[in-house]
Amino acid sequence: MIEFKNIEKYYGDFHALKNINLTFNQGEVVVVIGPSGSGKSTMLRCINGLEDITEGELLIKGTNLHAKGTNINEIRKNVGMVFQHFNLYPHKTVLENIMLAPMKVLKQSKEEAQKNAEKFLEKVNMLDKKDAYPSNLSGGQQQRVAIARGLAMGPGVLLFDEPTSALDPETIEDVLDVMKKLAKEGMTMIVVTHEMGFAREVADRVIFMADGEVLEDRETVSFFENPKDERAKQFLSKIINH
């Protein structure tokens, strides 16, 4: 479904992504881990065109994202993203936040958009807050609304960029529960996270990145039980022993 072919990414002289070759398949849950500054979020943001690549090819459902003539907005309809800091519109209600993109981009009627928004709010256990404003919600509640907003576009894949790192500990579990539910339903998900318990329980594969490189791309159990790369071993021992 998504292919990285010899991807390089520079910010000026800084080499952010180095020769990335990855394939993400339909229905997979892939967790991407690694130390800060390793290129995880950059790699994720390349998938929906928030970041350009410097060299290589990025294919989504066989379409080269950066080829001349590619309509990037059409591609983006198939790629949902959930950010670390929710990015909800503060002056709009929960329901309005979710209805906005389907009405503007997918040209849904107000009635259809509302019906779908309520369906996805129910899925993330937030239907009772549909008329609330983001400022009246906890971080965890806002993140669940952001997930519903991503789902409302009917994407083929959902990208999660550290979705729990800005949350209070007591609200993290609610967000992870929603993500686990989506995984069980067969949603294709690529998740940048430090939540190792979630990775162990839900991921089909784990990708470990450091200094802009993919150092491990392995089936979850074998990665956690027997990481081969020395930096992956050090990273796991630090994060699991804390």
Where are the language model's segments positioned?
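ABC family nucleotide-binding domain
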Residues: 1-220
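C-terminal boundary and immediately downstream tail of ABC-type ATPase nucleotide-binding domains
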Residues: 210, 217, 221-242
